[in-house]
A protein has these predicted regions:
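HIT superfamily nucleotide-processing domains
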Residues: 1-167
Length: 167
């Protein structure tokens, strides 16, 4: 007999707002020029050609993504200026996360195409995931659960404070 895996249920109060809200008809990375919605959209920083945004469903606390303003699905479609700004914002993300959470390492990556793991295929973005020794604890292994220790709003505020100290 095959074993049926059961989904663990955790209390995650920030998820209800997402679940009950109407689905976006636009790309989550096409943020436009309205900076008044940056906190709501978890935009941490706006560069000249790209921006830093928090992941609403993070692998770890502080999981950031860097995306170009232009809606393209592949790095090869970006200009040299856009590529340079993306990498500058990857570097800034690392600095912000070090200042805020003191991680011991980072995973930095791009998933291009569904088979490569891209959840959003048509707007390329780079993941910056802070890592600590032991952050892959027993919960995902035996309980199929990932524990994120603080609310996204708390993490957002910490990242913005660190950014203001760095810039």
């Amino acid at each position: 007999m095959s074993e049926v895996k059961r989904l663990a249920i955790l209390w995650a109060p920030w998820r209800m707002k997402y679940i009950e809200s109407p689905r976006r008809k636009t790309c989550i990375f096409c943020i436009g020029d309205d900076e008044s919605k940056d906190k709501e959209n978890l935009v941490v920083y706006r560069g000249s050609k790209s921006f830093i945004i928090m992941n609403r469903y993070p692998y770890n606390t502080g999981h950031l993504m860097i995306a170009p303003y232009r809606h393209v699905g592949d790095l090869t479609q970006l200009s040299d200026e856009e590529l340079l700004d993306l990498m500058k914002n990857v570097n800034l993300s690392i600095k912000i996360l070090r200042e805020t959470f003191k991680p011991e390492g980072f995973n930095i990556g791009v998933n291009i195409g569904r088979v490569a793991g891209a959840g959003i295929e048509d707007h390329v973005h780079i993941h910056v995931v802070p890592r600590w020794a032991g952050d892959t604890n027993f919960m995902p292994t035996i309980a199929q659960v990932k524990v994120i220790p603080e609310l996204l709003e708390t993490t957002y505020n910490k990242l913005k404070e660190a950014l203001s100290r760095l810039t």
